[in-house]
């Protein structure tokens, strides 16, 4: 266990989160294959410093380094399939570790999901709210026809029946997602048209949520504690309530 002086000298105790503008915000992205979730996120949240939690990114990087062409998964040998599965597991572990570090610092998050597993989303979002996060859902919607067309155009496509089944499953979860996050924290983006930029109303709605003032007593208390640690480390006065605030 750290003694008090070690505690003040430990650089890991004060996380980077206190210096980030958009701490305690978590944006969930939901939508099926070909919906354009990544494009919507890039157009609305780029430059915000939010940490992207998406195991697909790591998986694709691992596969590329290993020389696996994910467009040819249907033709993989047994050994290639085994390697692909191991790389997927490694990417998920890495994403979980990165996500945990981000949450430890209460950093803002962009969490990529499909919405098929609503139970998992609800559990994770509830956990984040327990820590003081403000959680939002951005539902990126398309018709099934557009989803199928875009899937064919993607570098890594999936079989058409999977796209259709996924689209139907996600549509069936919409009402539950609205209840889960609350109508005021749910933004639906109709993304059927090809365009170079995001609809201005959508952009404004998402940025408004991003800049919403923190109100959670848990979040405000965490910020107060982190500032107290910084002051203590800098040699500032430690008042009588310091230990109670930090160690309660």
Put a short name on every predicted segment.
Residues 32-33:
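The conserved Walker
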Residues 112, 116, 129-150:
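Conserved phosphate-donor/acceptor-positioning beta-strand/loop module used by diverse small-molecule
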Residues 2-17:
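Proteolytic processing junctions in secreted/extracellular precursors
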Residues 144-248:
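Conserved GTP-binding G-domain of TRAFAC-class P-loop NTPases and closely related GTPase folds
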Residues 36:
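Conserved glycine(s) of the Walker
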Residues 26-28:
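Short hydrophobic/aromatic beta-strand immediately N-terminal to the Walker A/P-loop
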Residues 17-24, 101-103:
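Phosphate-binding P-loop
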